[in-house]
Amino acid sequence: MSDQVEIDLFEEWFEGEFDNWGQASSNPTSWAHIFVKHEKIDDHKFLTSSRYNYEPNKPYREQVVEVTEPVVLGAQVSIIIVKNPACDMIFSYIESEKMFLGHSCEGCMWKDKPLESKARLYKDKYHTWDKGYWQGSEGFFHFDKSYK
């Protein structure tokens, strides 16, 4: 896949609103119902926000992230870096699974605590796992893309 096709695909899948209603409703003691929104605000820049369902107009986390052009790092042929104020994320396209697999760079900190993040981005799903500041002992959040 060419670099431009890869970045276009990543941004198409990344943009939108996601929620984990299925996960939260099946196990409400372990999973809060959360909305995650990635809104394109400029070429390769997104305003990202996370909100609880009971405060839909009050994000608890909001930031601007920038998607960079794919680069070559070590054994990985092509990766996309999401520049994030908390911690940069590195994504690689896994063609056999039709997904982008992401992880945080080493040494990330959020509010003076270590942070390790993992993500899987599919056409209609976004799975995230933050360990450290938010604990993350239950595993991945499973967000489904909303089409309105």
For every predicted segment, state its role.
Residues 1-6:
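Basic/polar N-terminal segments that are highly enriched at the extreme N-terminus
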Residues 7, 21-28, 54-148:
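Calycin-type beta-barrel ligand-binding domains and close structural analogs
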Residues 7-9, 15-43:
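Short, solvent-exposed loop/hinge segments that bridge or flank secondary-structure elements
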Residues 17-21, 47-49, 100:
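Short Pro/Gly-enriched beta-strand edge/turn motifs at strand-loop
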Residues 36-62:
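N-terminal glycine/threonine-rich, aromatic-flanked beta-hairpin/loop signature
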